[in-house]
C-alpha cells in the first residue's frame, strides 16, 4: 500500500474514533403570529433547529427523554456539534447518548438560520429579549416538534441565562436544569458596560445609517473585537500570543473570520436582547433540581462577585460550582468544553432521575 494511502486511512480512522455521535437532523419551524413582549408581532417567525435521537413517550404520551440545549450570543446550535461537546456527551454510553436521548439544538431568534434582522427587515425587525427567545423555544418544542416535557434544559452563556428563565417561566416542564457560564441576576456593572460599548459603537457609527447600510459598518469590527476580548482566558491568551506581533496576528485572524459572516444589525439586536434579563426576583419559582456551573477565569461572570454562591441558596434544590482556573479551562468558553464539567451533569441526571 502506498504511504499516502496509509496516511489517509490513519487520518480517517482517527476521525471515526472521535466522531462517535450521529449526524444531526436539521429542520425549520414557522411560528405563526409571534407576539413579542414589546407588543410587536411577526406573521411568521422562522426557527431553525438540529436534533439527534428520537423522542420516547410514556404510557400517558409524555416525552421523557428530550434535552434542550441553547447557545450563547452570536452563536447557533451548530456550536455544540464539535468534539469538545458532542464528542464528550452524545456518543454511545455517554451521558447524553443520542441513542437514549432526544437532543434539540435550536438557533435562537436573531441567530444562525432562524429569523433575524439581516434576512431583510433590518431595523424593522422587532426588538426581542430573552423572554421572547425562550417563548420561541417553547413554541418550537410544543407546536413544531410535539415535545411536551423536557428531561433536561441546559445552555451556555446567553443560553445559560435562558436556562434560568426556563425554570421560572415553565417550572413544571422539565426534570432538571443546568445553566453554564451565567449568573441569576440582572445584567449590570462590567457585564453591562462591555455590552454598551458594542451597542454604542454601532448606534453612533455614521456608517450604520440607522441600520440601512449597504456594506458592513466599521463598528462591526469594534463589536467583534469586544466579543473576542470578553471570551478570553488571560493565561491561555498569554501562552497563545506572548508577543505584540502574535497578539495582533491572532486577533486579525479572528476578525477576518468573523467579519466575513457577521452583521452589525444582528449583533446589535443580540446584545441588546439581554436588557430584559432579570431572574433574581423570581428564583423561588424554580422547582426542578438545578446545577449551575461557572469557571474561575470567566471575565463575563467573575467569581469574586460571589453572586452565584449567594443566589443559589434561594433554591431548595439548587447547587453551584465554580471550576478552578487550569490549563484546560477556556475562560468564558469553558462552557463548551464538556470534559471540565460533565461530572456535575452526571450528578444532576442521577439526582433528577424518576
Where would I find each of the regions flagged by the language model?
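Short beta-strand/loop motif that positions the catalytic acidic residue
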Residues: 286, 292-294
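N-terminal cap/lid subdomain of alpha/beta-hydrolase-fold enzymes
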Residues: 50-119
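Conserved hydrolase catalytic core segment
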Residues: 148-188
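Conserved alpha/beta-hydrolase "acid-adjacent" motif
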Residues: 299-306
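Conserved acidic catalytic loop of the alpha/beta-hydrolase fold
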Residues: 131-151
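Catalytic active-site module of serine/aspartate enzymes centered on a nucleophile-bearing elbow/loop
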Residues: 317-354
Amino acid at each position: 500500500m502506498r504511504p499516502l494511502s496509509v496516511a489517509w486511512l490513519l487520518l480517517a480512522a482517527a476521525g471515526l474514533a472521535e466522531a462517535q455521535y450521529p449526524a444531526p437532523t436539521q429542520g425549520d419551524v414557522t411560528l405563526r403570529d409571534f407576539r413579542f413582549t414589546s407588543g410587536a408581532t411577526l406573521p411568521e417567525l422562522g426557527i431553525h433547529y438540529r436534533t439527534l435521537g428520537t423522542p420516547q413517550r410514556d404510557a400517558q404520551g409524555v416525552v421523557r427523554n428530550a434535552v434542550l440545549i441553547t447557545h450563547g450570543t452570536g452563536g447557533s446550535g451548530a456550536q455544540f456539534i464539535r468534539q469538545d461537546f458532542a464528542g464528550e456527551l452524545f456518543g454511545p454510553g455517554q451521558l447524553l447518548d443520542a441513542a437514549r436521548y432526544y437532543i434539540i439544538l435550536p438557533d435562537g431568534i436573531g441567530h444562525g438560520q432562524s429569523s433575524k434582522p439581516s434576512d431583510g427587515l433590518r431595523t424593522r425587525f422587532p426588538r426581542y429579549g430573552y423572554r421572547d427567545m425562550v417563548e420561541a423555544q417553547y413554541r418550537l418544542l410544543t407546536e413544531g416538534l410535539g415535545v411536551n416535557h423536557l428531561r433536561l434544559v441546559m445552555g451556555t452563556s446567553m443560553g445559560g441565562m435562558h436556562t434560568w428563565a426556563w425554570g421560572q417561566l415553565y417550572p413544571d416542564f422539565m426534570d432538571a436544569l443546568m445553566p453554564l457560564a451565567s449568573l441569576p441576576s440582572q445584567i449590570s456593572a462590567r457585564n453591562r458596560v462591555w455590552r454598551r460599548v458594542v451597542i454604542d459603537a454601532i448606534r453612533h457609527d455614521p456608517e450604520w445609517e440607522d441600520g440601512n447600510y449597504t456594506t458592513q459598518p466599521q463598528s462591526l469590527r469594534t463589536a467583534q473585537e469586544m466579543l473576542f476580548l470578553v471570551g478570553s482566558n488571560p493565561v491561555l491568551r498569554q501562552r497563545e500570543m506572548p508577543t505584540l506581533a502574535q497578539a495582533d496576528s491572532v486577533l486579525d485572524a479572528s476578525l477576518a473570520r468573523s467579519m466575513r459572516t457577521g452583521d452589525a444589525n444582528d449583533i446589535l439586536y443580540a446584545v441588546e436582547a439581554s436588557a430584559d434579563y432579570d431572574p433574581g426576583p423570581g428564583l423561588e419559582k424554580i422547582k426542578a433540581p438545578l446545577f449551575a456551573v461557572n469557571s474561575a477565569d470567566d471575565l463575563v461572570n467573575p467569581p469574586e462577585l460571589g453572586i452565584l454562591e449567594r443566589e443559589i441558596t434561594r433554591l431548595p434544590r439548587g447547587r453551584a460550582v465554580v471550576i478552578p482556573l487550569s490549563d484546560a479551562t477556556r475562560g468564558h468558553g469553558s462552557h463548551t468544553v464538556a470534559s471540565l464539567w460533565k461530572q456535575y451533569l452526571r450528578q444532576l441526571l442521577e439526582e433528577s432521575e424518576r
